[in-house]
Amino acid sequence: MAKYEVEVWSKDNKPMGDIFHLCENMRWSKTRNDADMLSFDVDLTRYEEYIKAMGFGDNPKSFMEVGRNDIRVKRNGRYIVGTNIIKFGYKGSSSAVKMSVNASGYLNYYKKRYVTVNYSNKPQQDIMWGVIDTCNKMAGGDYGVRRGRHTGATVLRDRNQERKEVKSFLQQLSQVSKGCDFEITPDKLFNTYEAQGYYRPDMRLEYPGDIASFSFDRSVENVANVVYGIGSGNGEDAVQTKVEDATSQQAIYRREMIASYNSVTEIGTLTQNATAVLHYSKDPIELPSITVENGALDLSDVGVGDTIYIKLNGNKSLQHIDGYYRIESISVSVDNNGWESVELTFDDIDINDIISKQEAV
């Protein structure tokens, strides 16, 4: 059982109150190179009584409002999730009125921001920070994110793009060969890593045993071994490239994809992006998810990006799930007492390279 606090924060970055005791059906998640997520329900009458006692009774939206207030979650005294409120939902019945709260991590703010990028021979972590800093300097655009630290090696890159959405720019730069991971922490620091997380040979989960349940698909539905990259421009004037993998074509036939990057003006950048798509989509896809319960895994001791040992026993079709996998996402359901059900999703793409980078830290 963990001790949780669900803190509402003001737009001027001040804590306003803890509402965990009101939360029902709470769920939070963290995903590598993506936004945190948080959702929960409250009984509207209890909620309004509570904030009235705090001095917010005349206008409930003065305490918590969509788009304005942040919610930060503490677990055992440590901040684990930082989000901005995106949506309230209201549902009434004969017994009660419930308000659902949905909040998403700070990275999703940059889904609504666009910049023009011109960088030459620049460290990729500086390029990433540069687009956020550009957003900060626009009128009404300073979301409070500040630069944190970089861990690991540095790679120099060129980037020239027009009116590019910032979130996808950061994610695409993380996916190219030798791209770096990134995160925005609950206190709004932008950190970059050669490879986020730690190599954890001491941590091992098996089914049956520590793993309560698991699921995964093995699919070629989204496989592509020929990728046509289309950049800025119209028709034949557009910047274009093609990359392919003959080994994959021989194994599972030719499978094509068009990847559009309308803001990309340089062929080198376009080829890097198309090659990244090919790398991650040329083979049948498996992303094992496991669920652990009743404290079988200490969330204080594991995080997104960590590499741990996973083994599924009992059936020949599962025997290949036996080795080191990297945690891509952590999703946690929390009851009113702090009991948790934890779901981890993994992949093993480039796992030996990831381990070597994590061991070097």
Please place each PLM-identified region on the residue numbering:
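Beta-strand-rich assembly/attachment modules of structural machines
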Residues: 1-129
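Oligomerization/assembly interface segments of phage tail-like spikes and tubes
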Residues: 30-50, 96-108, 229, 282-295, ...
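Short, conserved beta-turn/loop elements at beta-strand boundaries and strand-helix junctions
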Residues: 88-94, 330-337
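Hydrophobic beta-strand residues in large extracellular and virion-surface proteins
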Residues: 4-8, 40, 71-73, 85, ...
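Acidic, small/polar-enriched beta strand-loop surface segments
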Residues: 2-7, 171, 199-336, 350-361
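Charged- and aromatic-enriched interaction segments used to assemble
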Residues: 94-220
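Well-ordered beta-strand positions in beta-sheet-rich domains
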Residues: 79-82, 100, 114-116, 202, ...
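Envelope-exposed proteins and targeting segments
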Residues: 36, 81, 97-99, 187-189, ...
